[in-house]
């Protein structure tokens, strides 16, 4: 899988892949990372890429020409590249999206917004999908793009050292993962559930299921509602 980050600040991207799992995945050739600076496509002598808004308003906007030209040059090399914009106005990115992109795509282009945003004409002309990472505003799309890249990458075979790590994770089937406990000395007054250490795997699985349901219902009632609908649909088949 190849990831191309279109950004005004490449240094925000490069450091993320210098440690841990994604560094190993990159070294092993399971993922390929590149970053493209929009300023390279500016015809302004000072490499300016932003402009004031039509109709007024606070903040500068990244002009459409530099975005479209950057994407056009990449698409000329790979027509199959999927163009994703990371913007507050996008649809919520989910675990299901991460799995889908990992399974179906080979090259993701992650366009990172900045300032007051990207000219809407560039989005309409180039975006295959527009994603948002949550109901909050970041200073730029780079953090969101890295989060998307991380979520997709770990679904690629071989990226995680233990493939079992993907099983039963939070958001699988709209449920949060059950609590986990380290095999270390118990802090005073903070014992783990006794069933976890008794070796009866059937009972452990049943307990984890109950705890997963309770955790989801408490922390994420929105997900729990989706889970209940999913289970209801299964019963109708």
UniProtKB/Swiss-Prot annotation:
<feature type="binding site">
    <location>
        <position position="113"/>
    </location>
    <ligand>
        <name>S-adenosyl-L-methionine</name>
    </ligand>
</feature>
<keyword id="KW-0963">Cytoplasm</keyword>
<keyword id="KW-0949">S-adenosyl-L-methionine</keyword>
<comment type="subunit">
    <text>Homodimer.</text>
</comment>
<keyword id="KW-0808">Transferase</keyword>
<comment type="function">
    <text>Specifically methylates guanosine-37 in various tRNAs.</text>
</comment>
<dbReference type="InterPro" id="IPR016009">
    <property type="entry name" value="tRNA_MeTrfase_TRMD/TRM10"/>
</dbReference>
<dbReference type="InterPro" id="IPR029026">
    <property type="entry name" value="tRNA_m1G_MTases_N"/>
</dbReference>
<dbReference type="Pfam" id="PF01746">
    <property type="entry name" value="tRNA_m1G_MT"/>
</dbReference>
<keyword id="KW-0819">tRNA processing</keyword>
<feature type="binding site">
    <location>
        <begin position="133"/>
        <end position="138"/>
    </location>
    <ligand>
        <name>S-adenosyl-L-methionine</name>
    </ligand>
</feature>
<dbReference type="GO" id="GO:0005829">
    <property type="term" value="C:cytosol"/>
</dbReference>
<dbReference type="GO" id="GO:0052906">
    <property type="term" value="F:tRNA (guanine(37)-N1)-methyltransferase activity"/>
</dbReference>
<comment type="similarity">
    <text>Belongs to the RNA methyltransferase TrmD family.</text>
</comment>
<dbReference type="GO" id="GO:0002939">
    <property type="term" value="P:tRNA N1-guanine methylation"/>
</dbReference>
<dbReference type="InterPro" id="IPR002649">
    <property type="entry name" value="tRNA_m1G_MeTrfase_TrmD"/>
</dbReference>
<keyword id="KW-0489">Methyltransferase</keyword>
<dbReference type="InterPro" id="IPR029028">
    <property type="entry name" value="Alpha/beta_knot_MTases"/>
</dbReference>
<protein>
    <recommendedName>
        <fullName>tRNA (guanine-N(1)-)-methyltransferase</fullName>
        <ecNumber>2.1.1.228</ecNumber>
    </recommendedName>
</protein>
<dbReference type="InterPro" id="IPR023148">
    <property type="entry name" value="tRNA_m1G_MeTrfase_C_sf"/>
</dbReference>
């Amino acid at each position: 899988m190849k990831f191309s980050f279109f950004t005004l600040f490449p240094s925000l991207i490069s450091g993320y892949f210098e440690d841990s799992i994604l560094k190993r995945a990159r070294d092993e050739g399971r993922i390929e990372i590149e970053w493209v600076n929009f300023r390279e496509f500016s015809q302004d002598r000072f490499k300016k890429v932003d402009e004031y808004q039509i109709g007024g308003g606070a903040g500068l906007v990244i002009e459409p020409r530099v975005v479209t030209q950057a994407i056009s040059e990449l698409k000329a090399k790979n027509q199959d590249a999927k163009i994703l914009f990371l913007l507050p106005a996008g649809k919520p990115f989910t675990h299901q999206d991460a799995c889908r992109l990992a399974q179906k795509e080979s090259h993701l282009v992650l366009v990172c917004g900045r300032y007051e945003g990207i000219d809407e004409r560039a989005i309409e002309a180039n975006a295959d999908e527009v994603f948002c990472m949550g109901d909050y505003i970041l200073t730029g799309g780079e953090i969101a793009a890295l989060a998307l890249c991380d979520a997709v990458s770990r679904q690629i075979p071989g990226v995680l050292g233990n493939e079992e790590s993907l099983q039963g994770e939070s958001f699988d089937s709209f449920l949060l993962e059950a609590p986990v406990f380290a095999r270390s000395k118990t802090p005073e007054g903070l014992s783990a559930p006794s069933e976890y250490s008794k070796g009866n795997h059937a009972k452990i699985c049943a307990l984890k299921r109950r705890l997963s349901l309770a955790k989801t219902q408490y922390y994420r009632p929105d997900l729990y509602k989706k889970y209940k609908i999913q289970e209801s649909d299964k019963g109708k088949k």
